[in-house]
Regions:
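HIT superfamily nucleotide-processing domains
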Residues: 1-149
Length: 149
C-alpha cells in the first residue's frame, strides 16, 4: 500500500518534491512538513523498503551513516546542541528516519522528552514548511552534507 513516503520519494525522483534538501547514497534528505523545530528533517529510503531490517547490511549501514550526516549538518548550521533520531514506521511502513535538532531555548520540560510527546499536535502543526522561508536553511544543510559525501 503506497504511503506518503512513497509519494514523496517518487516526487523527489521526478524533481518535483519541494522538501528535498539533497540526494544521498541511501535516499533523500528532506525538510519536514512542519518546522515548529527549525531544521526538522527526514531521510527517506530510496529504494523504498518496509523497514531497516529489510536492507542488506551494507545498505543498512549506509542509511544510518546518511542519517547521522544530516544530524552533523544540522549541528553545524543551526544552534542545536543535540540531535534526536527516530526510525518508527508504524504509521507509514516505509523506511524513513526523523531527525530533530534540539535547542537550549526549548523549555527544559520539553527538551528532555521526545518531540512527539513534548509538544501538542497544535504546537507541532504551528509552523508549516514554506519554501520561501526554508530555502536558505535547506541550502546550508545541503552544502554541509555534500562536503562529507
Amino acid at each position: 500500500m503506497p504511503t506518503l513516503i512513497h509519494q514523496r520519494v517518487r516526487a523527489a525522483q521526478a524533481g518535483t518534491n519541494p522538501y528535498v534538501i539533497c540526494r544521498m547514497p541511501s535516499g533523500w534528505a528532506v525538510l519536514g512538513d512542519q518546522q515548529f523545530i527549525s531544521g526538522y528533517s527526514l531521510l527517506l529510503s530510496d529504494p523504498i523498503v518496509p523497514d531497516l531490517n529489510h536492507l542488506e547490511e551494507k545498505s543498512r549501514l549506509q542509511f544510518l551513516r546518511d542519517m547521522t550526516l544530516i544530524g552533523d549538518a544540522l549541528l553545524a548550521v543551526t544552534d542545536a546542541f543535540r540531535i534526536n533520531y527516530e526510525i518508527l514506521g508504524n504509521d507509514a511502513p516505509a523506511l524513513h528516519a526523523h531527525i530533530f535538532p534540539r535547542y537550549m531555548n526549548e523549555p527544559e520540560r520539553r527538551r528532555k522528552y521526545p518531540v512527539w510527546t513534548a509538544y501538542s499536535k497544535e504546537e507541532r502543526d504551528s509552523r508549516p514548511f514554506e519554501l520561501s522561508k526554508d530555502k536558505e536553511l535547506m541550502e546550508r544543510i545541503a552544502h554541509m552534507i555534500k562536503q562529507k559525501l
